[in-house]
């Protein structure tokens, strides 16, 4: 879920305890219920990001920050060969159970990627960026792992939301767990891609809309507010 305090009514806010477990421990804890948690950002991302990725048969596609494997599954269904990385053992456990044939590895995207010897036709990195310390390293590593002309599809929680103090969170047994969101700007992401050996950048900003509010009624407060940023590019 991505919420701000305004999502909770006064009574709930008063009684809810808040914990900040850190990003990795937070996703480990969230992993068992992540796929069932109504989440406007994820819903919007699901609407656009696969369309941008357009996986083709036989392509090798890296899903960096693959979580529970929602995109790994769709990539596999398209006849491509996915490879998933994530640093949360809990999220990887769910992905492995769901997709036993897909290669997965535990990796911190703030470090050099453990994919030397692999080369990919496309890299997807969906809804991870605001958790990362070093996005410049990330895009350089993506560039190094792509074939010439290979595609990058990057989607992220819109910086305006993070700037408004909204962050990834979930609730369990009267406790709200907050996972944090770094305050990057749109330009921080776009410039880092641009400096990392990519060309043909296309940037899109997607706002909450009526269809999203139909799907998740409390997301009506995001009507016309930018929720999702995507950057597409090709390796030079
Ligand atoms: C919001 S989930 C998105 C998962 C998936 N991409 C999706 O669209 O469902 C964010 C994921 O990023 C992972 N993550 C966050 N920081 C990370 C890091 N530094 N290195 C690797 N994975 C990270 C989390 O473990 C989690 O699985």
Predicted regions and their residues:
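Short alpha-helix
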Residues: 181-204
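Conserved Class I S-adenosyl-L-methionine
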Residues: 200-236
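Class I SAM-dependent methyltransferase SAM/SAH-binding core
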Residues: 62-64, 68-111
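A short SAM/SAH-binding and catalytic strip from SAM-dependent methyltransferases
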Residues: 122-135
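A short glycine-rich, Lys/Arg-flanked "PGG" loop and its adjoining helix->strand segment in the class I
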Residues: 136-148
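Conserved class I S-adenosyl-L-methionine
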Residues: 2-56, 70-74, 91-94, 151-180, 207, ...
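A short acidic, Gly/Pro-enriched loop at the edge of an enzyme's catalytic core
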Residues: 114-123
């Amino acid at each position: 879920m991505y919420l701000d305090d305004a999502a909770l009514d006064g009574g709930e806010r008063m009684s809810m305890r808040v914990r900040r477990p850190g990003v990795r421990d937070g996703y480990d804890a969230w992993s068992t219920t992540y796929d069932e948690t109504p989440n406007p950002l994820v819903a919007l991302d699901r609407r656009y990001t696969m369309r941008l990725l357009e996986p083709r048969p036989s392509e090798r596609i890296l899903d960096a920050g693959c979580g529970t494997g929602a995109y790994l599954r769709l990539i596999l269904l398209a006849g491509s060969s996915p490879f998933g990385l994530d640093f949360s053992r809990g999220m990887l456990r769910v992905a492995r159970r769901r997709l036993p044939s897909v290669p997965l590895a535990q990796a911190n995207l703030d470090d050099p990627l453990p994919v030397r010897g692999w080369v990919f036709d496309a890299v997807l990195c969906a809804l991870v960026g605001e958790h990362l310390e070093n996005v410049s390293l990330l895009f350089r590593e993506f560039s190094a792992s792509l074939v010439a002309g290979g595609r990058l599809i990057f989607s992220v929680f819109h910086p305006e939301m993070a700037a408004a103090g909204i962050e990834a969170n979930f609730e369990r047994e009267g406790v709200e767990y907050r996972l944090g969101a770094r305050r990057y700007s749109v330009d921080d992401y776009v410039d880092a891609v641009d400096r990392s050996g990519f060309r043909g950048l296309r940037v899109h900003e997607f706002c909450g809309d009526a269809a999203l509010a139909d799907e998740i009624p409390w997301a009506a407060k995001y009507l016309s507010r930018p929720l999702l940023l995507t950057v597409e590019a090709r390796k030079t």
